[in-house]
């Protein structure tokens, strides 16, 4: 049996390599997903830095600083931007998943599965940092509310004290006049500003939590794609291993056959030599 015959049939694909495939659509989508994923990961990294900075302000007890509100606004904008990118990349992933397996080679199928898994990982990371950010902002709001309540109590106490002093100063009081005591205009303005910020943050936190719930539906779709692609790649790898095992077994059998053929040929030579010697011996006897 020749080597070509032995390694024919089912193992032909192994020696000829993966089937040729040219899918411009897959290549375009792969590049789009990779670019979108790069942008998402960069934005997530920035959001993580913003969240860490906000935590440091909480640790210092300085939640009323103007920079806290600036970071909060930028963080909320980042979350909205990343959410839009997630939805966009999910659309690209669905298009890429819709490409028929028959039009892709094994390398492309594995590359597709890796991209889908990377997108899934980034999505989970985004969900995690969203939850961290909302927890941090809840702490900021709690501290801000406590500070605002303390300021309000201090102002009320100061007003009461002022009223008592004016009531006790009868010598300087004009009969029939009405005492009107107002909070300092600057303090009133700051109080209203801080109160408005707290309300805005509460609304933003609610919006983010609602966004997390909405994106969970996207993640379910993505998780289904990941599972399908994972099964497909596992089957490909199993086929590769099976083919490799079959090839190794065939190679072993071929080596055994070749060794047997060599031994057989060697014995044939020995037998031929013995026959020649015997014929020569008979010939010499007959000559005598």
Curated annotation (Swiss-Prot):
GO terms for biological process: cytoplasm to vacuole targeting by the Cvt pathway; Golgi to endosome transport; Golgi to vacuole transport; Golgi vesicle fusion to target membrane; intracellular protein transport; macroautophagy; vacuole inheritance; vesicle docking. The chain crosses the membrane at residues 269-288. InterPro entries: SNARE, Syntaxin, Syntaxin/epimorphin_CS, Syntaxin_N, T_SNARE_dom. GO terms for molecular function: SNAP receptor activity; SNARE binding. It is a single-pass type IV membrane protein. Ubiquitinated. It is found in: Membrane. The modification Phosphoserine is found at residues 2, 23. Keywords: Coiled coil, Membrane, Phosphoprotein, Transmembrane, Transmembrane helix, Ubl conjugation. GO terms for cellular component: cytosol; endomembrane system; endosome; endosome membrane; fungal-type vacuole membrane; Golgi apparatus; Golgi membrane; SNARE complex. Plays a role in the sorting and targeting of vacuolar proteases. This is Syntaxin PEP12. The gene is PEP12.
